[in-house]
Amino acid sequence: MEEMVSQNTEGDKSIDDHWQTEGAETQPGLHETFPLGVLKARVALLATAIGGPDHTSEQEAAPYKLGDDCLACLKDLKRWFVLVDQKQKRWDVASAAAEFRILEEDLIPILVQWEQKMSQGIKQSKVSGLPLSECIKNKQYHGKIALNAFQLMVWMTWPMTLNEESSKNQVHHYSGLKKHQLAYKKAILQAHGGKVVKAAVRIATEVIKIDRLDRSVQDNSLIRLVLNFLRNILAIEPGEVTVSAKQLSKSRNINTSDMLPPNISVDDICLNSVVSVFKKFKVFPFLLTISSSMGHEFEAEYVCLPLLEVAFYLTKDIDPHLLSLKADNPPQSLQNCGNKVSNGQGVVSGQLGMELIHLLDKERHHKMSQIRSSSTRHSRFGGFFSIQTPNNGRLTISNGHSALDHDLALNNIDKKKKWNKTTRNTAEAVQGIPVGVLNGEFNLTFLSHDNRSCLKWFLANFVDSSFNILLKNLIDYFTADEFNQQILQKLQFLLFYAWFLKFERDRCQKGETDGIFVSEALQDTSHILIIKFLREAHELKKWPLVHAAMLAITELLNYLDVLGEDWEEDVVGIYTKIFSNERLKLFSTIPRTASRHSLHYVKACINMNHAIMTTLERFNKNNKDLIIKGFRKRMITRFIVKEGKTTSGDVNGNKNGQDTTRDADEDAISSDEETNMISARLDFKKVLDAYFNGTVIDTYIFYLKHFTELTEEDIKRVLYFLNHILCSNEESFLFRVDFMIVLKEMLAPGGLSVTGHTRIRINEFSDHFMAKLKRKLEKSPFWYINILFPNLHDRELGYYLRYGQQRPNTQSIHKVVAPTMFKHIEGEENMSEQQLKDLKIGVLVSTLLDDGKNHFVEEINRIFKLVVEGYEKHYQNNERSATLHYPRVDFRSDMFDMKRALLFDSDLRALMTTLGYHVADTEVEPCYIGGIFYFPDLSSALNSLEQYMAIPFHTPNGLPSSSYLLRSIDYKSGVDADAKVGEAMRIDQFSDEMADMALSENANRYFEDLNRMEERLEGKQIPRGTAKKRSAIKPKSRKSQPTGIGGIDDDTPVINKSKRKKQLFLSNEFIMDSDDEEELVASPIFYENEIYLRFILNKYQGNLPSHLFSVFSRFANERGRMAGAVVGDYTDLFNGPVPSIEELKSMENSTTHHGLKEILQLQPRDHLSLSPNNENNSAHSSENLSSDSENDNITNDIPLSDSEYNSSNSSQYANTAKTSIIDPPSSKTSLLKLALTHEADVESEDDFIPRKRARKVRLEDGEEY
């Protein structure tokens, strides 16, 4: 109950702000614990003073009469609820109010009386034409009383739950209050024909009459209060709640007695009674009005969650399939009863009749089972056995069949054992969630023919008009406010989503709709939110939420399966997003722990698996490719396959090569360099492999053990998965004793029905399974022992036990780098082949030694020397002079990191290639030497290697050895594993001149950066407080742009297929747009303050005392507020009166004039670069530099904001080679244009160059943001 109060917004609290303040003054002990006796006495006094029956009336039924202080008493009672039940976590006030029957004897009569007065007044107003206020006496006063009584009724009927934070007092009162709420529900539904519900709807309609723009927060809260009242009526039921296992259960008294109070039956509070009252007082049209107009006439934040709860409690116990059946075709269990059931003694109707039918059906099945297994009266004579146990106990068996059937005898003994009651998994118990909410089965809910038709009409109209609107607002709520969400709300949302998709699926199958009315459920936001709930709940181990999410995903897949051809493109698009690699990995992980949970949880898990597998298998059988996409960095390649490598026929193929096909073939992935996205075809075989796990088999066997509780459809889903195991060479997972026992029990006489189709399927599967087992035992006799124990999880041994052979040693295939290329060598045309090879060996050896890789070179020299000596011994001297075919010798080394260097060191790979080795293309391939060689060439290569290891190598050009090498910029990125290295090494299209130019260009940029370093350091030495100018933006030349690998342009083919970054483009619609110049002009006060700041800094020689900084800040802020005027005393800052701005400007002009004149006199004439505007190329005089146009008010320029005006952020312009002097513009407009052009260069570092702020819009993938 305190949850309801805590959920009230400011609008709810504003309803009674006056009495809350008054209560704080009149009640001295706000948070004190009142004695229970005193509290009950005060509640009793309030109950008496509210009102009571008027026995002085002449009417036969005494009418209810309000007390003189009825309104004040109701407010006091509300105050007690807040002060005690909410703030102290006690339910003493609710218990006392239930004891004195306040709701039945006071609140209900007050609301019924107010409803009658309002109804009569409206009729009288229509007849007489008078205003309603004149037809009803004290209308406003009675309205306040009805409103306070209604709010109390909502509080007293609020659903009650226990959790770990519940106090002992709440646990103590829980059982009694639950029974009282059942009595409340009966009274509300039956008192005066249920007119309390009509009064609640009238309270809401009074608010609906007000225009939306004129409604207050209190008005919107009243609509929500009415919806909460309807929700309370639906939610009250004699159910159980889960409580924490950490709390003691001795003092709870929960479930120790019947939850139904005296004189109340199930029919009084069942859903059939609620629907009858709702239909009578037009509650369903009211709900349709609220839900269909959400967002237009009603605020969604007030009504979306209450509507969700109303829809959830209205449908949670109803099977959508029963509602979709026609009235003349009821289900088989109801064909013999209709609305009434005869039990041989009388007629029973309603909910009790439904339960009686269920019990009679169970009794019939038990009798039939007893007849099949029992013997006749004559054969029982003498059929009694007694067995003495080792502990002197005795087991007795009767029945003659026990003597003939040993299994039946043992089963009879087992039935007499006292088994410990199975305990529910405590991890599934989430606080406040009723146990029956996730039972996975729809309870037996009786609905009369009229009520069923009415409910179906409402739900169909709700789907057609309101489902999309409500679902969209709920998704917005759950995606926007993630911190205030309760797990119960998420669970209700998921079950609401699943139920209505199932309901719409039945309608689609009958042709009543085409699926457009639940299109919001097919949006990306919907299934993304559902899978997000699933992932988060699985990580946090919130198993009820996982259960609900699995139901929602299952219904979504089943619904997509029934949509027509018009939806085919949309359905495939949804499949590609649902079946991404990350989500498939999550789906295949959930069944591994399902066997630890309840049977209904396992059922939901198996149904989800079945929906996923059948969907993917349908694509596989129809030879349709399901293309999934993902980002390059996050793409998991576990479930994808190269195009054309796997077909539908490969699904049942051999498993021995599974590990090699499981490896990621990145060349199979279709990549998009521009968008950084990759796509590939989903492989059904690999998806099945993810489910072939011992723990997943445990889940299916656990589910199959309860075959007596499963339907024929449930068993078919299990057999579907087990058949895939048998057909995929994974049958060893099923070679288990417990699985064989389950099959034996199902085929036993007391198992499945002999005439059912399920038994035939199980029998066929059993024959196939036993044939597989027989062949396995003949091939591998060790399975006689292995079958008795659980499966081994050892990687090598488990593989041998399953497949009868050793596990192949395979590795993942990754990329390797291409060997280093050689640039043009001077005079190579005049060299012989042997001389050029000797030079290349010297270059590579010298480069490796310079890089500190001498240990690699020594190891290569040692192994290569052994190879040459072996070849020398193998052939005769006369044979070594010819070109012969030499045997293959693999390169083997025990040196640490040698193998990695042979794959990812391009210089080392180039040396091996030069010596005659074949370098590896992939990680799994070896490096070897062999083939047709001329032996003197090998000997010469060995001599060159040893020579340059001992003697320093001198390059012909005098530069380092690496200057002859053409390397890749990124050494980690190489050629694809499946590509030929020789193809990647082609450089015919790269001219040596281009490579030389690229290398020299890179070197020039490097030295230019070093030269500019001194200029950047010198530029930092500027006076304090002086802003740095920003150099004009110039278009970058082609030479300054980064090039590709080795200086080669990106447009040409490159050596390695490296991944390129996604390019970002700038829109040219905004760059330097100077149309709206007036909007960018700042206040002139800002620049005047800058003049004052420069004056003060110059006065103190750039070292302004710390205490004067705050004084100047106060001075600048005052000038900004007073439009340039100053009223404060700033004598200390200026050492006298404040100078005028005109004086400071004239001082700065004269200082600038003399300073620039001296600079010009010192500059050589040859170094002056004149403005292109001067046709005579004559130098400007000093008068020109001090002209009025240059010293025009700077406040007319385009400024930076205060936060942007920072000298540290200003770019520096340092060019000591030339000094460019710009002819001063003659107007402000020309100054603006000149400041914003790319060619404007300014010579003085002290000049302030205003710049315009340009909005930069980043365009990615061709889209504008």
Swiss-Prot record:
What's the protein here called?
Topoisomerase 1-associated factor 1
- InterPro entries the record matches: Timeless, Timeless_N
Q: Give the PANTHER family listed for this entry.
A: PROTEIN TIMELESS HOMOLOG (PTHR22940:SF4), TIMEOUT/TIMELESS-2 (PTHR22940)
Specify whether DNA repair is a keyword of the entry.
Answer: yes
- Where is it predominantly found? nucleus
Query: Which subcellular locations apply to this protein?
Result: Nucleus
Q: Per the similarity annotation, which family is this?
A: Belongs to the timeless family.
Any one Pfam family match given in the protein's UniProt record, by short name:
TIMELESS
Q: Quick one: which gene encodes this?
A: TOF1
Q: Which organism is it from?
A: Eremothecium gossypii (strain ATCC 10895 / CBS 109.51 / FGSC 9923 / NRRL Y-1056) (Yeast)
- In this chain, composition skew of type Polar residues spans 650-659
Cite the source lineage.
Eukaryota, Fungi, Dikarya, Ascomycota, Saccharomycotina
Q: What does this protein do?
A: Forms a fork protection complex (FPC) with CSM3 and which is required for chromosome segregation during meiosis and DNA damage repair. FPC coordinates leading and lagging strand synthesis and moves with the replication fork. FPC stabilizes replication forks in a configuration that is recognized by replication checkpoint sensors.
Query: Could you mention a single GO BP entry for this protein?
Result: DNA replication checkpoint signaling
Keyword DNA damage recorded: yes
